[in-house]
């Protein structure tokens, strides 16, 4: 796990508004969009309308150039390239960042997106699918999570089941058979469209079970299941919660699903001093949700202390010094004060998850159990 101060500032999601404009993402400071003049951008503008020019590749590349030159953390180490050599803004961005991509400092943190994709990913996590996640060994595939709001859960799929065969429309094929004919992931699981059906054969409790599932649009609950109290003789119970992702549903979930505040209220009322937080598959999300989570866990212990600081490159000292760009611990009505927190982590634990671990570490006894984070 890396110190978070450099990590957050290195992320640069470039969001295109109406093709030619720009805006900030949930992970980076909002850059000022350049004005697309439709003239000296390196593209052919003859015969195009002003709107078409603003939505053209040349205008998008101009936008990427302006944002990276101004805001990218390692702006002085980017490659100088000819904009006219690139057919897309993403290709141009990759070319400029090649030294940072090659040495691993930028591990795919910088990419092109749209407002709709960005908001969907970070606010609700909504997508079209079956509603489960898998992990594989050399010869086996296991269900590691089934989303309570999804079709797979409704059909009976649960964590720990082993997937052994799939019927893509012509009868069941084992994983070995699918591998032997080099079936693609899309062949096996189908395209991301509502109504796509697959029949799966699972092993559960040493028995085979066949389940048919149709893909649907779903928004996975932020918390996996209910927060738990693990009883122990002669001591207060241990608290446990599994947070899938830092999305708005962690604070304001759909009816019937728990929030982070529900979890900490439960722990507070049970006088929990030792807490387990499962971040194994949590790749991050909204800073605002991470900020609230830290308030719920150390808002009393560390009131007024910084929980994180968003730092950008040295071209923006005023931004770096502005306390409005810091997170400060604040006590909330549901805040409780654990003495010890154990985080279960893996190589998939990233971004906002690492921020929470780092932010709590000076104020709470923190340990990481499992694999190193991303």
What would you call each of these model-derived segments?
Residues 1-8:
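Bacterial N-terminal signal peptides that target proteins for export
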Residues 15-18:
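C-terminal motif of bacterial Sec signal peptides marking the signal peptidase cleavage site
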Residues 234, 284-343, 348:
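Gly/Ser/Thr-rich loop/hinge elements
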Residues 363-374:
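Short, well-structured beta-strand/strand-turn elements
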Residues 22-275, 289:
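Flexible, low-complexity junctional segments that flank or bridge functional domains
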Residues 356-357:
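Secretome/extracellular-domain signature
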Residues 147, 244, 347-348, 372:
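Residue-level signal for short, function-critical loop segments
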């Amino acid at each position: 796990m890396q110190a978070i101060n450099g990590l957050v500032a290195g992320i640069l999601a470039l969001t295109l508004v109406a093709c030619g404009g720009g805006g900030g993402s949930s992970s980076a400071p909002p850059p000022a969009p350049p004005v697309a003049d439709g003239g000296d951008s390196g593209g052919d503008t003859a015969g195009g309308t002003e709107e078409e020019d603003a939505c053209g590749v040349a205008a998008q590349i101009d936008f990427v150039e302006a944002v990276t030159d101004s805001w990218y953390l390692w702006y002085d180490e980017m490659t100088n390239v000819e904009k006219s050599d690139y057919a897309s803004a993403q290709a141009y961005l990759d070319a400029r960042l090649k030294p940072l991509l090659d040495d691993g400092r930028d591990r795919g943190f910088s990419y092109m997106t749209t407002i709709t994709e960005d908001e969907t990913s970070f606010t609700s996590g909504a997508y079209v699918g079956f509603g489960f996640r898998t992990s594989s060994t050399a010869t086996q595939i296991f269900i590691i999570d089934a989303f309570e709001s999804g079709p797979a859960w409704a059909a009976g799929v649960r964590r720990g089941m082993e997937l052994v065969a799939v019927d893509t429309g012509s009868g069941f094929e084992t994983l070995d058979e699918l591998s032997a004919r080099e079936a693609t992931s899309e062949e096996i699981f189908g395209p991301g469209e509502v109504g796509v059906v697959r029949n799966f054969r699972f092993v559960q409790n040493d028995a085979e079970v066949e389940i048919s599932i149709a893909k649907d649009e779903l928004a996975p609950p932020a918390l996996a299941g209910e927060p738990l109290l693990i009883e122990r003789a002669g001591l207060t119970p241990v608290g446990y919660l599994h947070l899938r992702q830092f999305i708005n549903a962690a604070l304001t979930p759909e009816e019937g699903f728990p929030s982070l505040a529900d979890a900490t209220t439960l722990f507070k009322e049970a006088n929990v001093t030792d807490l387990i937080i499962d971040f194994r598959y949590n790749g991050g999300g909204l800073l605002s949700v991470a900020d609230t989570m830290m308030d719920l866990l150390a808002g009393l212990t560390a009131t007024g202390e910084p929980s994180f600081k968003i730092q950008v490159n040295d071209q923006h000292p005023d931004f770096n010094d502005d306390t409005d760009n810091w997170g400060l611990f604040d006590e909330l009505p549901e805040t409780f004060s654990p003495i010890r927190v154990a985080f279960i982590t893996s190589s998939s634990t990233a971004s906002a998850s690492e921020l929470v671990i780092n932010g709590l570490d000076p104020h709470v006894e923190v340990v990481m159990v499992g694999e190193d984070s991303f």
